[in-house]
Amino acid sequence: MILIEHILGNVKKDPVWREKLKDATFDLLILDQREAQKSRCRKSSTQGLDLGISLDRNVVLADGDVLAWDEETNVAVVVQINLRDVMVIDLSELKSRSPDELIKTCFELGHALGNQHWKAVTKHNEVYVPLTVATTMMDSVMRTHGFQHLPFRFVKGAEILPLLTNSEARLLFGGAEDTDTHVHVASPLDEPHGSGLHIHGIHSHEEGHSHGDHDHDHSHSHGDHDHDHKH
Protein backbone atom coordinates (compact mmCIF):
# COMPACT_ATOMS: atom_id res chain seq x y z
CA MET A 1 0.00 0.00 0.00
CA ILE A 2 1.19 3.52 -0.84
CA LEU A 3 0.52 5.93 2.02
CA ILE A 4 -0.70 9.39 0.99
CA GLU A 5 -0.39 11.98 3.79
CA HIS A 6 -0.20 15.20 1.80
CA ILE A 7 -1.80 16.73 -1.29
CA LEU A 8 0.89 17.90 -3.71
CA GLY A 9 -1.29 20.38 -5.58
CA ASN A 10 -4.29 20.58 -7.84
CA VAL A 11 -4.10 20.19 -11.60
CA LYS A 12 -7.34 22.15 -12.13
CA LYS A 13 -6.67 25.08 -9.81
CA ASP A 14 -2.88 25.41 -9.69
CA PRO A 15 -1.32 26.71 -12.93
CA VAL A 16 2.10 25.38 -11.87
CA TRP A 17 0.82 21.82 -11.61
CA ARG A 18 -1.33 22.23 -14.70
CA GLU A 19 1.78 23.10 -16.69
CA LYS A 20 3.90 20.43 -15.01
CA LEU A 21 1.44 17.66 -15.83
CA LYS A 22 0.23 18.84 -19.25
CA ASP A 23 1.86 15.82 -20.94
CA ALA A 24 1.56 13.41 -18.02
CA THR A 25 -0.47 10.22 -17.85
CA PHE A 26 -3.16 10.40 -15.17
CA ASP A 27 -3.78 7.40 -12.95
CA LEU A 28 -7.16 8.38 -11.52
CA LEU A 29 -8.36 7.79 -8.00
CA ILE A 30 -12.13 7.90 -8.56
CA LEU A 31 -14.19 8.78 -5.50
CA ASP A 32 -17.89 9.27 -4.99
CA GLN A 33 -19.16 12.25 -3.04
CA ARG A 34 -19.19 10.42 0.29
CA GLU A 35 -15.68 9.02 -0.04
CA ALA A 36 -14.38 12.47 -0.94
CA GLN A 37 -15.44 13.82 2.47
CA LYS A 38 -13.22 11.38 4.37
CA SER A 39 -9.71 12.33 5.42
CA ARG A 40 -8.88 8.63 5.71
CA CYS A 41 -9.75 5.86 3.29
CA ARG A 42 -8.15 3.04 1.31
CA LYS A 43 -8.88 2.53 -2.37
CA SER A 44 -7.19 1.46 -5.59
CA SER A 45 -6.52 3.76 -8.52
CA THR A 46 -7.66 2.92 -12.04
CA GLN A 47 -4.21 1.46 -12.74
CA GLY A 48 -4.34 -0.72 -9.64
CA LEU A 49 -2.24 1.24 -7.13
CA ASP A 50 -3.30 0.42 -3.57
CA LEU A 51 -3.57 3.85 -1.93
CA GLY A 52 -4.02 4.59 1.75
CA ILE A 53 -5.26 8.16 2.25
CA SER A 54 -4.30 9.58 5.65
CA LEU A 55 -4.72 13.35 5.60
CA ASP A 56 -4.91 15.79 8.50
CA ARG A 57 -8.31 15.94 10.14
CA ASN A 58 -10.74 18.31 8.37
CA VAL A 59 -8.68 18.16 5.16
CA VAL A 60 -10.78 16.72 2.34
CA LEU A 61 -9.90 15.81 -1.21
CA ALA A 62 -10.93 18.00 -4.12
CA ASP A 63 -11.42 17.14 -7.77
CA GLY A 64 -8.04 17.43 -9.50
CA ASP A 65 -5.87 16.96 -6.40
CA VAL A 66 -2.46 15.48 -7.20
CA LEU A 67 -1.58 12.73 -4.73
CA ALA A 68 1.61 11.37 -6.28
CA TRP A 69 3.84 12.00 -9.28
CA ASP A 70 6.57 9.81 -10.75
CA GLU A 71 8.72 12.21 -12.72
CA GLU A 72 10.61 9.41 -14.48
CA THR A 73 7.52 7.72 -15.91
CA ASN A 74 5.55 10.99 -16.02
CA VAL A 75 2.58 9.35 -14.31
CA ALA A 76 0.52 11.28 -11.76
CA VAL A 77 -2.13 9.98 -9.38
CA VAL A 78 -4.99 12.48 -9.62
CA VAL A 79 -8.33 12.58 -7.80
CA GLN A 80 -11.56 12.50 -9.79
CA ILE A 81 -14.69 13.14 -7.74
CA ASN A 82 -18.10 12.18 -9.08
CA LEU A 83 -20.65 14.50 -7.48
CA ARG A 84 -24.41 14.48 -7.77
CA ASP A 85 -26.18 17.27 -9.59
CA VAL A 86 -27.64 20.06 -7.46
CA MET A 87 -30.95 21.91 -7.59
CA VAL A 88 -30.29 25.65 -7.17
CA ILE A 89 -33.23 27.73 -5.95
CA ASP A 90 -32.82 31.48 -6.48
CA LEU A 91 -34.30 33.55 -3.64
CA SER A 92 -33.20 36.94 -4.98
CA GLU A 93 -36.67 37.97 -6.13
CA LEU A 94 -37.91 37.73 -2.54
CA LYS A 95 -35.93 40.86 -1.69
CA SER A 96 -38.64 42.91 -3.38
CA ARG A 97 -41.40 41.29 -1.33
CA SER A 98 -42.77 42.53 1.97
CA PRO A 99 -41.16 41.12 5.14
CA ASP A 100 -44.29 39.07 5.82
CA GLU A 101 -44.23 37.52 2.34
CA LEU A 102 -40.51 36.83 2.57
CA ILE A 103 -40.80 35.08 5.93
CA LYS A 104 -43.86 33.08 4.83
CA THR A 105 -42.23 31.89 1.58
CA CYS A 106 -38.95 30.93 3.26
CA PHE A 107 -40.79 29.07 6.01
CA GLU A 108 -42.95 27.15 3.53
CA LEU A 109 -39.93 26.34 1.37
CA GLY A 110 -38.11 25.01 4.43
CA HIS A 111 -41.15 22.90 5.26
CA ALA A 112 -41.36 21.47 1.74
CA LEU A 113 -37.65 20.59 1.58
CA GLY A 114 -37.61 19.24 5.11
CA ASN A 115 -40.68 17.11 4.47
CA GLN A 116 -38.68 15.31 1.78
CA HIS A 117 -35.71 14.92 4.14
CA TRP A 118 -33.59 16.72 1.54
CA LYS A 119 -30.33 18.26 2.67
CA ALA A 120 -29.85 21.91 1.86
CA VAL A 121 -27.37 24.75 2.17
CA THR A 122 -28.36 28.42 1.83
CA LYS A 123 -25.74 30.79 0.46
CA HIS A 124 -25.52 33.86 -1.79
CA ASN A 125 -29.34 34.22 -1.87
CA GLU A 126 -29.61 30.67 -3.19
CA VAL A 127 -30.56 27.29 -1.77
CA TYR A 128 -28.49 24.28 -2.87
CA VAL A 129 -30.18 20.87 -2.72
CA PRO A 130 -28.32 17.71 -3.87
CA LEU A 131 -30.37 15.42 -6.13
CA THR A 132 -31.54 12.23 -4.47
CA VAL A 133 -34.38 11.53 -6.92
CA ALA A 134 -35.00 12.28 -10.59
CA THR A 135 -35.08 15.95 -11.59
CA THR A 136 -38.70 15.49 -12.71
CA MET A 137 -39.65 14.49 -9.17
CA MET A 138 -37.85 17.46 -7.62
CA ASP A 139 -39.47 19.74 -10.19
CA SER A 140 -42.87 18.28 -9.26
CA VAL A 141 -42.31 18.93 -5.55
CA MET A 142 -41.40 22.57 -6.22
CA ARG A 143 -44.43 23.18 -8.43
CA THR A 144 -46.92 21.21 -6.34
CA HIS A 145 -45.98 23.23 -3.27
CA GLY A 146 -46.48 26.47 -5.19
CA PHE A 147 -42.87 27.60 -5.63
CA GLN A 148 -42.96 27.95 -9.41
CA HIS A 149 -42.46 31.71 -8.94
CA LEU A 150 -39.00 30.99 -7.52
CA PRO A 151 -36.46 30.39 -10.31
CA PHE A 152 -34.69 27.05 -9.92
CA ARG A 153 -32.31 25.08 -12.09
CA PHE A 154 -30.23 21.92 -12.02
CA VAL A 155 -26.43 22.16 -12.28
CA LYS A 156 -23.42 19.89 -11.88
CA GLY A 157 -22.20 19.40 -8.33
CA ALA A 158 -18.68 20.37 -9.40
CA GLU A 159 -20.02 23.82 -10.28
CA ILE A 160 -21.31 24.36 -6.73
CA LEU A 161 -18.45 22.76 -4.78
CA PRO A 162 -16.01 25.71 -5.09
CA LEU A 163 -18.63 27.99 -3.52
CA LEU A 164 -18.81 25.94 -0.32
CA THR A 165 -16.76 25.69 2.84
CA ASN A 166 -15.54 22.23 3.85
CA SER A 167 -18.34 21.86 6.39
CA GLU A 168 -20.97 22.97 3.87
CA ALA A 169 -19.59 20.54 1.27
CA ARG A 170 -19.68 17.76 3.84
CA LEU A 171 -23.31 18.56 4.64
CA LEU A 172 -24.38 18.86 1.02
CA PHE A 173 -22.45 16.00 -0.58
CA GLY A 174 -21.41 13.69 2.23
CA GLY A 175 -23.78 10.76 2.05
CA ALA A 176 -26.56 12.43 0.08
CA GLU A 177 -27.07 9.11 -1.65
CA ASP A 178 -28.14 7.59 1.68
CA THR A 179 -30.99 10.04 2.18
CA ASP A 180 -34.54 8.70 2.08
CA THR A 181 -35.74 9.01 -1.50
CA HIS A 182 -39.47 9.02 -0.83
CA VAL A 183 -41.32 11.98 -2.31
CA HIS A 184 -44.41 13.68 -0.89
CA VAL A 185 -46.20 15.92 -3.34
CA ALA A 186 -49.24 16.89 -1.28
CA SER A 187 -49.88 20.52 -0.43
CA PRO A 188 -48.24 21.73 2.79
CA LEU A 189 -51.76 22.25 4.16
CA ASP A 190 -52.39 18.53 3.80
CA GLU A 191 -49.38 17.52 5.88
CA PRO A 192 -50.32 17.00 9.53
CA HIS A 193 -46.72 16.90 10.75
CA GLY A 194 -43.41 18.46 9.96
CA SER A 195 -43.73 22.18 10.61
CA GLY A 196 -39.95 22.65 10.69
CA LEU A 197 -36.97 22.04 8.48
CA HIS A 198 -35.29 18.69 9.07
CA ILE A 199 -31.71 18.39 7.89
CA HIS A 200 -30.31 14.98 8.74
CA GLY A 201 -26.63 15.52 9.46
CA ILE A 202 -23.62 13.51 8.45
CA HIS A 203 -22.17 10.68 10.51
CA SER A 204 -18.42 10.78 10.00
CA HIS A 205 -16.40 7.78 11.14
CA GLU A 206 -12.78 6.77 11.04
CA GLU A 207 -11.73 3.51 9.37
CA GLY A 208 -12.99 0.44 11.11
CA HIS A 209 -16.08 2.10 12.61
CA SER A 210 -19.38 1.61 10.88
CA HIS A 211 -23.10 1.55 11.51
CA GLY A 212 -23.53 -2.16 11.10
CA ASP A 213 -26.39 -3.93 12.73
CA HIS A 214 -26.95 -1.69 15.75
CA ASP A 215 -29.79 0.76 16.20
CA HIS A 216 -29.77 4.31 17.42
CA ASP A 217 -32.48 6.78 18.26
CA HIS A 218 -32.85 10.46 17.59
CA SER A 219 -35.65 12.87 18.23
CA HIS A 220 -37.40 15.61 16.31
CA SER A 221 -39.52 18.32 17.79
CA HIS A 222 -42.71 19.15 15.90
CA GLY A 223 -44.41 22.20 17.32
CA ASP A 224 -45.73 21.22 20.74
CA HIS A 225 -44.87 17.54 20.75
CA ASP A 226 -41.82 15.32 20.35
CA HIS A 227 -41.34 11.89 18.94
CA ASP A 228 -38.45 9.52 18.43
CA HIS A 229 -37.22 7.74 15.35
CA LYS A 230 -35.33 4.45 15.57
CA HIS A 231 -32.80 3.49 12.91
From Swiss-Prot:
One of its GO terms (molecular function) is unfolded protein binding. GO terms for biological process: protein folding. It holds the Pfam family UreE_N. It is found in: Cytoplasm. Residues 203-231 have a biased composition (Basic and acidic residues). Its main location: cytoplasm. It comes from the Bacteria. The keyword Glycoprotein does not apply. GO terms for cellular component: cytoplasm. Residues 185-231 are annotated as: Disordered. InterPro entries: UreE, UreE_N, UreE_N_sf. Keywords: Chaperone, Cytoplasm, Nickel, Nickel insertion. Involved in urease metallocenter assembly. Binds nickel. Probably functions as a nickel donor during metallocenter assembly. Belongs to the UreE family. This is Urease accessory protein UreE. It comes from Yersinia pestis. The lineage of its organism: Bacteria, Pseudomonadati, Pseudomonadota, Gammaproteobacteria, Enterobacterales. The gene is ureE.
